Amino acid sequence: MLKNPHTKYRPANPFAGVVPGGRGLSDRTWPDNTITRPPVWMSTDLRDGNQALFEPMNSERKMRMFKMLVEIGLKEIEVAFPAASQTDFDFVRELIEGGHIPDDVTIEVLTQARPHLIERTFESVRGAKRAIVHVYNAVAPNFRRIVFDTDRAGVKQIAVDSARYFVEMAARQPGTDFTFQYSPEVFSGTELDFAVEVANAVIEVWQPTPQQKCIINLPATVEMSTPNVYADQIEWMHRHLARRDSVLLSVHPHNDRGTAVAAAELAVMAGADRVEGCLFGNGERTGNVDLVTLALNLYSQGVHPGLDFSRINEVARTVEHCTQLPIHPRHPYVGDLVFTAFSGSHQDAIKKGFAVQQPDAVWEVPYLPVDPADLGRSYESIIRVNSQSGKGGIAYLLEAEYGLVMPRRLQVEFSAAIQRITDERGTELSAGDIWRAFEEEYLAVAAPYAYVEHHLAEHGGQQGISLTVEEAGVRRVLRGVGNGPIDAALHALDAGAVLLGYEERAIGQGGDARAVAYIELADGEGGGSTFGVGIHANIVTASVLAIVSALDRLAQRRERADGVGRQVAATR
């Protein structure tokens, strides 16, 4: 690092020559505003997020992502850059021709400001009921000088010509209700007077009305300043955009400085109507703004975001599958450890908070900004597993002594069982004690189902299973068909559970090696999720054992919940 970084770096100053002193608004009003309703959300997971992956999503993952975004409640979804590849073009066509787009959802497609690309983009959405077509060109001074070797007039003309071509192309497809969107790329580093000049020139071409609005999107393509500077930029544009009542003012913050969430929130306070981003902050470089954090920040303040994250673990597993990227264990609201306390004083305060928290009262549990149950999660306390414990921790002991490597979320779940035992004994547990507790919790559970045997067979191109279990002392043969042994076994048991995750590992090496399978299932009746574990020399058998284990533990959880419910009812 340089001793004098000012010789190489300068703070961005988009207000130079626009306001007196050139250092932001002196009459800003956004600090006095609060967010009382959610903005329009637009997911770009399938476009900006997808293009930033090591390996872009295949068609199966794209469709799975799209359907999940719809289930969450997204009404605007950017699905592709159709002129960039045949794969993207074909995906848009599949969405339209396959009837996958609900009536209340609008897809969005992106194009650069070039006639042949615009034409290809409009062709991709032919037959759609509604579509947002989004065009952009970079307008910042370093792009004008270094990338395009042109001046302000040249950049502005590109935008205006593209806007005119949009009108012409839309007229050729009268069956589609089009919304036009324009982004002055790298707005965050552009002189404000020029940014508004270009945006207003585009608006003049499109002639939007309050009934047929256009979208002007102001991206922090590269985050260059503190969030308050971005908010000042948005408020200035909010004041100076032409036909403001006919324009949806949109923002697209990136996270280069780590403050995209704050920038988006302040931008909404400053007048933005709409926010573009990705689930869990995927996207180029450091990512786009995280729509989940934004939405749940609103929720924690008593404002419903209009998006449903009541099964956030399932959303997280789907995103990890589709993107092949892990979610950080400390990620707000969704990370495996965010509802976990290692500190004894934190654990004590949280337990006391839960003890006095009334079901219909304002949430006041210390250290927890929202009720984990609202997100389909639970408070999970890991005890004696950090550096302050004086021991290696539960997971370390099981791995070191028994070769068992547990998924992080299973570590969290199993720690609750260890907590109960240590509370009862009042002493520390040995590795043997922990292993016996693990066997009892996951491997020896046999009610309502006890596994007996299974047989696999091909069934019309799918996997069929004949599964023998013992239930209440009676043997039953259950049959199911699925995409593989796990899917087939779930269908055979017909328990209404949803598969959230599956992992398999080896215990030991050589001829004595065994397989361990971990299955995470969500209760279809809304009771959260739980793990099952199976260990066997055969990996398929281990997997079936894990499914039976998980279903047995879900059933026991339901029984405990019903018992608590009866006790509460009896005291009323």
From Swiss-Prot:
<keyword id="KW-0479">Metal-binding</keyword>
<keyword id="KW-0100">Branched-chain amino acid biosynthesis</keyword>
<dbReference type="GO" id="GO:0005737">
    <property type="term" value="C:cytoplasm"/>
</dbReference>
<comment type="pathway">
    <text>Amino-acid biosynthesis; L-leucine biosynthesis; L-leucine from 3-methyl-2-oxobutanoate: step 1/4.</text>
</comment>
<feature type="binding site">
    <location>
        <position position="288"/>
    </location>
    <ligand>
        <name>Mg(2+)</name>
    </ligand>
</feature>
<keyword id="KW-0963">Cytoplasm</keyword>
<feature type="binding site">
    <location>
        <position position="252"/>
    </location>
    <ligand>
        <name>Mg(2+)</name>
    </ligand>
</feature>
<dbReference type="InterPro" id="IPR000891">
    <property type="entry name" value="PYR_CT"/>
</dbReference>
<keyword id="KW-0028">Amino-acid biosynthesis</keyword>
<dbReference type="InterPro" id="IPR036230">
    <property type="entry name" value="LeuA_allosteric_dom_sf"/>
</dbReference>
<protein>
    <recommendedName>
        <fullName>2-isopropylmalate synthase</fullName>
        <ecNumber>2.3.3.13</ecNumber>
    </recommendedName>
</protein>
<feature type="binding site">
    <location>
        <position position="48"/>
    </location>
    <ligand>
        <name>Mg(2+)</name>
    </ligand>
</feature>
<dbReference type="InterPro" id="IPR013709">
    <property type="entry name" value="2-isopropylmalate_synth_dimer"/>
</dbReference>
<feature type="domain" description="Pyruvate carboxyltransferase">
    <location>
        <begin position="39"/>
        <end position="313"/>
    </location>
</feature>
<keyword id="KW-0460">Magnesium</keyword>
<feature type="region of interest" description="Regulatory domain">
    <location>
        <begin position="445"/>
        <end position="572"/>
    </location>
</feature>
<dbReference type="InterPro" id="IPR054692">
    <property type="entry name" value="LeuA-like_post-cat"/>
</dbReference>
<comment type="subunit">
    <text>Homodimer.</text>
</comment>
<keyword id="KW-0432">Leucine biosynthesis</keyword>
<dbReference type="InterPro" id="IPR005668">
    <property type="entry name" value="IPM_Synthase"/>
</dbReference>
<dbReference type="Pfam" id="PF00682">
    <property type="entry name" value="HMGL-like"/>
</dbReference>
<dbReference type="InterPro" id="IPR002034">
    <property type="entry name" value="AIPM/Hcit_synth_CS"/>
</dbReference>
<feature type="binding site">
    <location>
        <position position="254"/>
    </location>
    <ligand>
        <name>Mg(2+)</name>
    </ligand>
</feature>
<dbReference type="Pfam" id="PF08502">
    <property type="entry name" value="LeuA_dimer"/>
</dbReference>
<dbReference type="Pfam" id="PF22615">
    <property type="entry name" value="IPMS_D2"/>
</dbReference>
<dbReference type="GO" id="GO:0009098">
    <property type="term" value="P:L-leucine biosynthetic process"/>
</dbReference>
<comment type="similarity">
    <text>Belongs to the alpha-IPM synthase/homocitrate synthase family. LeuA type 2 subfamily.</text>
</comment>
<keyword id="KW-0808">Transferase</keyword>
<dbReference type="GO" id="GO:0003852">
    <property type="term" value="F:2-isopropylmalate synthase activity"/>
</dbReference>
<dbReference type="GO" id="GO:0000287">
    <property type="term" value="F:magnesium ion binding"/>
</dbReference>
<dbReference type="GO" id="GO:0003985">
    <property type="term" value="F:acetyl-CoA C-acetyltransferase activity"/>
</dbReference>
<comment type="function">
    <text>Catalyzes the condensation of the acetyl group of acetyl-CoA with 3-methyl-2-oxobutanoate (2-ketoisovalerate) to form 3-carboxy-3-hydroxy-4-methylpentanoate (2-isopropylmalate).</text>
</comment>
<dbReference type="InterPro" id="IPR013785">
    <property type="entry name" value="Aldolase_TIM"/>
</dbReference>
<dbReference type="InterPro" id="IPR039371">
    <property type="entry name" value="LeuA_N_DRE-TIM"/>
</dbReference>
